[in-house]
Amino acid sequence: MTDEADADPQPFAVPPAPGAPAANKPARKPRRTVPRTSEFRIAEQPGFVLHSYPYRETSLVIDVLTRDHGRIALVAKGAKRPHSALRGVLQTFQPLSLSWSGKSELRTLTGAEWVGGMLPLAGDALLCGFYANELLVKFCAREDPHPPLFQHYLVTLTRLAHGEPPVQVLRSFERVLLRETGYAMTLKRTVARRAVEPGKLYVFDPERGVRDADSDVPPHWPVIAGQTLLDMEEDDYHRAQTVAQSKTLMRFLLNTYLGGTPLATRQILIDLQNL
């Protein structure tokens, strides 16, 4: 690291474990800055590895999600060498402090440190984490930062690591992802600006939003109960109907917005866990 840029004093706000007592709230929120050494050198940026693949003989290209710079591609030189310090650091689902340089689409990683503070994912939670990563790669354009989405991804990993129900965690993440990347996800009001009623039936127009389920809607649009939409708005998935219909709705929307491009991890979840 260089001394020309001050490090962010608390780059990750890791959520507490479920049931843990809340910490005292500070009187004033500290001002956050983006450390950088020059126009094309970024220092100590909070980030996560989403995906990596081999590059030349000894290096890797890592696709990372960063808090203030969005999704970027970095060359990790020498990371494939047996004794490289980067081999154990550049892991998915672990908070990192990343530094890089360059101005092309493919930048050069100059530093990576493990921040810690998060439990590893395993089992179903690990599959869900890979699914979330694939969605981020598909929906997030390069260098298009979404700090709220970055924070929600951190929350999602924390919830999965602590054993919260994957169905609820994934539906919440999917909704935030669509909202932050430009897709309207208001579920409590219709396109006609009327409040959604629990006892009525609706459809979700991918281009406009919630509509009444009348005879002129395309037959492949799933019909959803108003109660389901209201439950999803509140992240309440205790009703079996809400669990089933929310899964159908989100599959429909994700498939539509991706132009029919299949998600590899989604099929695994369908086959193994029905998530």
Curated annotation (Swiss-Prot):
UniProt xrefs under SUPFAM superfamilies: ArfGap/RecO-like zinc finger (SSF57863), Nucleic acid-binding proteins (SSF50249)
Xref: InterPro entries: ARFGAP/RecO (IPR037278), DNA_rep/recomb_RecO_N (IPR022572), NA-bd_OB-fold (IPR012340), RecO (IPR003717), RecO_C (IPR042242)
GO process annotations (BP): DNA recombination; double-strand break repair
Pfam family, any one: RecO_C
Coiled coil: none
Top-level taxonomic group: Bacteria
GO cellular component: bacterial nucleoid
Annotated region described as Disordered, given as residue ranges: 1-36
Keywords for the protein's UniProt record, in alphabetical order: DNA damage, DNA recombination, DNA repair
Family matches, as Gene3D superfamilies: Nucleic acid-binding proteins, Recombination protein O, C-terminal domain
PANTHER family to which the protein is assigned, alphabetical: DNA REPAIR PROTEIN RECO (PTHR33991:SF1)
Family: Belongs to the RecO family.
Function noted in UniProt: Involved in DNA repair and RecF pathway recombination.
NCBIfam families for this protein: reco
Protein name: DNA repair protein RecO
Organism: Burkholderia thailandensis (strain ATCC 700388 / DSM 13276 / CCUG 48851 / CIP 106301 / E264)
